[in-house]
Regions:
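Local cysteine-cluster metal-coordination motifs and their immediate loop/turn environment
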Residues: 25, 29, 51-73, 90
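Residue-level signal for inorganic ion chemistry
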Residues: 7, 58, 99
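Short helix-loop-beta connector
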Residues: 44-49
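Short beta-strand scaffold segments in enzyme catalytic cores
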Residues: 5-14
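Zinc-dependent deaminase
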Residues: 63-146
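A structural microfeature
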Residues: 18-19
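Short, basic/aromatic recognition patches
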Residues: 1-2
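Acidic helix/loop or adjacent segment enriched in Glu/Asp that either coordinates divalent metal
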Residues: 22-40
Length: 146
């Protein structure tokens, strides 16, 4: 497996809970995207919602037209909580910054980072790609959280 393992929980303002994990219903789907899709299929209002994720929401993707950060911003969610910033192994993620720039509250729970990273040891144990030498235009770079 050459993609991050990520889980997400979305909680609407009225307390509805939706979960998702990477590659749950399609090979290119991210965890946040899965939770958003379930919420929308249920007719939930996502404005003002909070989404919790084990990893920073992506800021760029090759496999889809919208990043998870963009999906969150588009739906006017209020808050994003995640355990670990996406490691600079494949692409330099700017999800946290794009969310903050859009006025979304961001909370990083660094106390849970170790567990989130352990779930991805299959990727993090290999050689590290130099993020300065790699760009988000690399054909497979933005799909590693798929």
């Amino acid at each position: 497996d050459k993609a991050y393992s990520v889980g997400a929980v979305l909680v609407t303002r009225d307390g509805q809970v939706f979960t998702g994990y990477s590659r749950e219903t399609a090979p290119d789907n991210h965890a946040e995207e899965e939770a958003i899709l379930k919420a929308e299929q249920a007719g939930a209002t996502l404005e003002g919602a909070t989404i919790y994720s084990s990893m920073e929401p992506c800021s760029t993707r090759r496999s889809k037209p919208r990043s998870c950060s963009a999906l969150i911003i588009d739906r006017r969610m209020k808050r994003v909580v995640f355990a670990v910033r996406e490691p600079d192994r494949f692409v330099r993620c700017r999800g946290e910054q794009s969310l903050r720039d859009a006025g979304i509250e961001v909370c990083v729970l660094e106390s849970l980072a170790k567990q989130a990273l352990e779930a991805n040891a299959h990727i993090l144990s290999g050689p590290i790609v130099n993020p300065a030498a790699e760009s988000s235009t690399r054909p497979d770079a933005a799909d590693r959280r798929a």
